[in-house]
Amino acid sequence: MKMRGVSVGVLVVAMMSGLAMAGSCNSQEPDCGPSECCLQGWMRYSTRGCAPLGEAGSSCNVFTQAPVKGFYIGMCPCRAGLVCTRPSATCQLPSQDNTLDSYY
């Protein structure tokens, strides 16, 4: 009976590690879908995983809009056609007054 419990425990751990690896990524395009980016958390040794791109109205960070070695840190950029606005830190449709060019 004890051996059966150990076998079930090993099986559960193996399944969990397989699930964790399924969403991992090493670079931007090859591993993630077209509406996702390869994202690493803010902590130094965070694992990378695929996450959705920012939609209109979602939070964003103007400093995380460019990939670092093929992955993003902290937040995915806004999806194509949207820009991350500095005043509100949200993904929005581009306009004359909310593009980054107007701040430089």
Swiss-Prot record:
Keywords: Disulfide bond, Secreted, Signal. It holds the Pfam family Prokineticin. It is found in: Secreted. Cytokine directly involved in hematopoiesis. It comes from the Eukaryota. Belongs to the AVIT (prokineticin) family. GO terms for cellular component: extracellular region. The keyword Secreted applies. This is Astakine. The keyword Phosphoprotein does not apply. Residues 1-22 form the signal peptide. Disulfide bonds join 25-38, 32-50, 37-76, 60-84, 78-91.
